[in-house]
A protein has these predicted regions:
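Conserved positions in beta-strands of structured domains
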Residues: 113, 186, 250-252
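N-terminal lobe/hinge region of extracytoplasmic solute-binding protein
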Residues: 43-48, 59-119, 244-246
């Protein structure tokens, strides 16, 4: 499975001694920032597999987003989270994974796995629901969803390297002899199709689960204009009512810089226990508000229905609420934003490339990351450092495997010295060519959390004579740097997904991946450790025995925690507020599923 790009005060001590980094449990025990009191004033309601109660139709959900969509195109959505948030409401995946029960469940299709142990092959048979349609808003026109839609998307969109889909490389498996073989798809009939794996794989449903677009629109565009024709479909300047939907919603209005309006799709397949079509909501109005303070003001004024709290909002919304809303809380997030450094050889003439490609430099940066200070000053004590690669729900999570490069200025200085980076008489860090150590740190303009975190990083590195220039930019500019120009130094970024399965991140961890952030799309591994990661990732994918698999994934995690290509930041405890005009019977909020409002209805 591939990832998508997404973007997530006490006195400070300035001694050079190591500062202990407290866990969330320790912070709670010490009463830091009144965590116990805050939790007592909020609602804990994680989803644990409960059935959803029948509701009633009606109501308009009012929400806000930070970012403009780049397109309404499913292919573009792979690299743009703002686009993905919109497009995915008009599509559906074949399956969904229930993290509570740890099992796959049907969505658009049912799946059956057939293993041929003698031939060492595997086939996944899918059968689409019979009530799936590409529907058009305010029209009787409906086009049946068939296996041809899935097969076309797999072969002609994801499977065409010219389309630059992040799913391309995952269609190939490395065979025991080192050769590559393709995972083929074949049509059985109008509803049924099958993926044939040339060797047995550990997570075939994860590997084959996918979204797909309408063949009757994308195929003519590709025949006429190739990959560019595909990517130019559904631009933001079209009439959105012309976009078909097989999902919960139609997009019926888009006013650039202002808002989007969605209407429920009455032909959507999902029904409640009484057979009523979902969602219950008739409409959703989404305002585009880049400024987080304005988002907060809209919520407090009753002009939006929900709001995800920042640390600085806790006191005002939790301790001084007006009774018009309820705040839910969740445990620390499974994933975290990270700090990473550009190792792309396109920049090999820059001094930063020489520094960033040495693991001792990256390890030193991890030792200069004062996570306790970030937790206290940025998160008000409501977070904890992410030291492990895999989260606890991952079956191969190993609590003994933790990051070893914690906040320690002396150790950082020793690591830098080992690669010839030392302070001069004026306290400025210089490399072995007498160049001052200075680099940029790119962050999103809309995120106050990233801005505050970057300021702490700059301050901590300055203690050792390293200059950091904070570059604030919008998300689209960050995406351009990461995927097109590669002209960045370091960046704070986040990815969707949380490694619930060890083989998630097929476009992140292998060196060929387009989200192998620090040096993407490698033809051959640039380093020995990346070659080893490629090998382990591949072996782990095909290892069924849990004991053998544990050894593989342990080494995989250990290498990445040692090499520090991604330095993870904080796991944040979540707080989410919702207007009390809604019925909360089917509302849940937790760190695995986020905010569950699919079955919400108006009081």
């Amino acid at each position: 499975m591939k990832y998508l790009l997404v973007i997530l005060c006490l006195c400070c001590f300035f001694s050079c001694s190591r500062t202990q980094e407290l866990s969330l449990a320790e912070l709670e025990a010490q009463g830091t920032e009144g965590l116990s009191e805050i939790l007592a004033k909020t609602v804990s309601k994680p989803w644990r597999g409960e059935e959803f109660a029948p509701g009633r139709l009606g109501g308009t959900w009012r929400s806000v987003v930070k970012d403009e969509p780049k397109s309404f195109n499913l292919l573009i959505a792979e690299q743009d989270s703002a686009t993905a948030a919109i497009v995915r409401s008009m599509h559906d995946s074949l399956l969904e994974y229930d993290m509570v029960r740890r099992e796959w469940k049907p969505r658009a299709a049912e799946a059956q796995i057939v293993v041929d142990e003698k031939a060492n092959t595997l086939t996944v048979f899918y059968a689409l629901r019979d009530d799936l349609y590409w529907s058009y808003y305010n029209s009787d026109r409906k086009v049946k969803v068939t296996s041809d839609d899935v097969i076309f998307w797999y072969n002609e969109i994801e499977g065409d390297p010219a389309c630059l889909s992040s799913g391309f490389h995952s269609q190939f498996l490395t065979m025991p002899d080192g050769s590559e073989a393709h995972v083929d798809i074949r049509k059985i009939d109008e509803r049924r199709f099958a993926f044939h794996f040339p060797r047995i794989i550990a997570d075939p449903l994860l590997h084959t689960n996918m979204d797909f677009g309408p063949r009757h629109i994308y195929e003519p565009a590709k025949k006429q204009g190739g990959a560019d024709g595909v990517r130019n479909l559904f631009r933001v300047d079209i009439d959105p009512k012309t976009i078909p939907s097989m999902g919960e919603w139609f997009l019926v209005e888009y006013t650039q810089g202002q808002r989007m309006v969605f209407k429920r799709n009455p032909n959507y397949w999902r029904k409640d226990a009484n057979g009523a079509s979902l969602p219950y909501l008739e409409e959703e109005i989404v305002r585009i508000i880049p400024d987080e303070n304005t988002q907060l003001l809209l919520f407090r004024n009753g002009e939006s229905d929900s709001y995800r709290l920042r640390p600085e909002d806790i006191d005002g919304l939790v301790n001084r609420g007006d009774g018009s809303y309820t705040v839910f809380n969740s445990e620390g997030s499974l994933s975290a934003a990270f700090w990473t450094f550009n190792q792309n050889p396109q920049n090999k003439d820059k001094p930063q490339y020489e520094w960033f490609t040495q693991k001792e430099f990256r390890q030193a940066m991890s030792c200069l990351l004062n996570r306790s200070r970030i937790n206290t000053q940025v998160y008000r004590g409501l977070a904890e450092p992410k030291y492990s690669l895999f989260p606890e729900p991952n079956p191969y999570y190993n609590p003994a495997l933790k990051l070893q490069y914690l906040y320690d200025l002396k150790r950082a200085e020793t690591l830098l010295s080992s690669i010839g980076i030392k302070k001069d008489s004026a306290g400025v860090m210089r490399d072995n060519k007498n160049r001052p150590v200075e680099f940029d740190l790119s962050i999103r303009s809309e995120s106050t959390i990233n801005q505050d975190t970057a300021s702490i990083i700059r301050d901590e590195l300055a203690k050792l004579g390293i200059k950091v220039n904070i570059r604030v930019m919008d998300f689209q500019k960050q995406v351009e740097q990461l995927f097109s120009t590669f002209d960045w130094d370091s960046i704070i970024m986040g990815l969707s997904g949380s490694n619930i399965f060890p083989s998630q991140g097929s476009n992140v961890w292998p060196s060929t991946g387009n989200l192998h952030m620090w040096n993407p799309n490698q033809e051959t591994p640039a380093t020995d450790w990346e070659a080893r990661i490629d090998y382990l990732y591949n072996e782990g994918k095909f290892t069924i025995d849990p004991v053998k698999a544990q050894g593989i994934w342990d080494e995989f995690q250990s290498i990445l925690l040692e090499e520090c290509p991604l330095i993870h930041l904080m796991r944040t405890r979540g707080f989410w507020a919702i207007n009390n005009r809604w019925d909360f019977t089917n509302v849940y909020f937790d760190n695995m599923n986020g905010a569950e409002i699919s079955y919400i209805w108006l009081k």
